[in-house]
């Protein structure tokens, strides 16, 4: 696992690490201090992932705004 404050190399790696953290936390087998550290790392990864998604959305909007024929509509994620 990367260092606690180190950003993953890609969005996909961050998501994979976050999924592993969720699995560890859901198992209920971690000592309290380790669970808190894992939770903290998960929050960091979630925030980094959200920032990367926002950057990607901005890039798409910029690219579409360069094309006058393309219509730009706000993104609304599907709630699962």
From Swiss-Prot:
What Pfam families does the database record attribute to this sequence?
A: Exonuc_VII_S (PF02609)
Q: Does the keyword Secreted apply?
A: no
Substrates-to-products reaction catalysed: Exonucleolytic cleavage in either 5'- to 3'- or 3'- to 5'-direction to yield nucleoside 5'-phosphates
InterPro entries documented for this protein: Exonuc_VII_S, Exonuc_VII_ssu_sf
Coiled-coil stretches are none
- Does the record bear Hydrolase in its keywords? yes
The EC code for this enzyme is 3.1.11.6
- Keyword terms: Cytoplasm, Exonuclease, Hydrolase, Nuclease
Entry's Gene Ontology molecular function annotations = exodeoxyribonuclease VII activity
Write down the superkingdom of origin.
Answer: Bacteria
- Give its localization: Cytoplasm
What's a GO biological-process term for it? DNA catabolic process
Question: Which family, according to UniProt?
Answer: Belongs to the XseB family.
Function, as annotated, reads: Bidirectionally degrades single-stranded DNA into large acid-insoluble oligonucleotides, which are then degraded further into small acid-soluble oligonucleotides.
Q: Which NCBIfam families match?
A: PRK00977.1-1, PRK00977.1-4, xseB
Query: What is the name listed in the Swiss-Prot or TrEMBL entry for this protein?
Result: Exodeoxyribonuclease 7 small subunit
**Quaternary structure and interacting proteins, as annotated:** Heterooligomer composed of large and small subunits.
Any one GO CC term of the record = cytosol
Report the Gene3D superfamilies cross-referenced here. Exonuclease VII, small subunit
């Amino acid at each position: 696992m990367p260092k606690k404050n180190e950003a993953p190399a890609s969005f996909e790696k961050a998501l994979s690490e976050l999924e592993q953290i969720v699995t560890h936390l859901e198992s209920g087998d971690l000592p309290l201090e380790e669970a808190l550290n894992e939770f903290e790392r998960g929050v960091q990864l979630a925030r980094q992932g959200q920032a990367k998604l926002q950057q990607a959305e901005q890039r798409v909007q910029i690219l579409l705004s360069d094309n006058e024929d393309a219509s730009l509509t706000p993104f609304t994620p599907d709630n699962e």
